[in-house]
Amino acid sequence: MIIKPKIRGFICTTTHPVGCEQNVREQIAFTKSKGAIENGPKKVLVIGASSGYGLSSRIAAAFGSGAATIGVFFEKPGTDKKTGTAGWYNSAAFDKVAKEEGLYAKSINGDAFSNEARATVIDLIKQDLGQIDMVVYSLASPVRKMPETGEVVRSVLKPIGQPYRSTAIDTNKDVIIEAEIEPATEEEVAATTTVMGGQDWELWMSALQEAGVLAEGTRTVAYSYIGSDITWPIYWHGALGKAKEDLDRASAAIDSQLAKIGGGANVAVLKSVVTQASSAIPVMPLYLAMVFKVMREKGIHEGCMDQIYRMFAERLYNNHNPAELTDDKNRLRLDDWELREDVQQACRELWPKVNDANLFAETDYQLYKDEFLKLFGFGVDGVDYDAEANPEADFEVITL
């Protein structure tokens, strides 16, 4: 079929398999161009492995460190009538290139919050790898089905305390609007922490450790975002921020458990990038359009792959000066360039000046739009979008 983008709100309902594969190949080529990661991991589990930072982590481990990887994700395959999710095509492409290069790669498609997923992963590790030495936790799901009760808990993107009013972009019409969001209730904050906090990460690490599949010196990392005062009301000081604080709590608990086997846990605080998750957050598209422009002008702009390679090579597996690599909460800070005062001050000055007439000129909004479409495999260089594409992509995957 000939596949074109169809956008509804902050989701593109179609995806392009060839474009997704090309995206993955570009990330792999970038990783290889940077060279091997010194002292990198060799057997890696990535929970949430099909897009964004999770996919980049799997690529960094496999193609930067020669690691065997197991990826867990929840995606829909394409059929002869309908395209699958981008994450399905990303994972199919990863599997294809990994196999071409003789790397071990196995994938599990199912609910990563479930006990079944944990049991399946543990069996697979025992059968194929014996033990693993790194666990990346990169889930960004709006809902969580509780493994014991089956209750479905939903997260919210809301402020705490008072309504949040701010300039934002209506990304369907490309115009500036005033967004207003009512504050979260106590129940909504608690639910958001249940879904987006550190509890599930702890369940995974406990299950893996109890099963004896974690090697001596195992490292684990989960991803967070703090941002600046521009986005704090909706993010760090909002319901999502409470969930991310819970991630810090979990990190400390897991770290003390892993210390028994000479390992450790960290939260990695990453920069803002265009992902399906970030496009759903009011204010983020406008902030991203601004911060991209400022960081590009200063020569410090990074995408998912750049960030994750830097995290592996310069933070997580940099054994030269470990004390300097974390902040006072033992977090790996990869948002250091974004949060530089000169970058944030430029964004603050730009914020009140942006209007409908100058949106494209004063910010990198076009880059934001391009990056958003690329998430779904569209607008990728070297892909013929007028050609027929096969929406069915099969690869070695265990479906739960």
Curated annotation (Swiss-Prot):
GO molecular function, one term: NAD binding
Pfam families, sorted: Eno-Rase_FAD_bd, Eno-Rase_NADH_b, Enoyl_reductase
Source domain of life: Bacteria
Keywords: Fatty acid biosynthesis, Fatty acid metabolism, Lipid biosynthesis, Lipid metabolism, NAD, Oxidoreductase
Residues that, per the record, bind substrate: Y225
Coiled coil: none
Ligand binding (NAD(+)): 48-53, 74-75, 111-112, 139-140, 244, 273-275
InterPro entries assigned: Eno_Rdtase_FAD-bd_dom, Enoyl-CoA_Rdtase_cat_dom, FabV-like_NADH_b, Trans-2-enoyl-CoA_reductase
Active site positions: Y235 (proton donor)
Subunit record text: Monomer.
NCBIfam families reported in the protein's UniProt record: EnoyACPredFabV, PRK13656.1
Protein name: Enoyl-[acyl-carrier-protein] reductase [NADH]
Species for this entry: Marinomonas sp. (strain MWYL1)
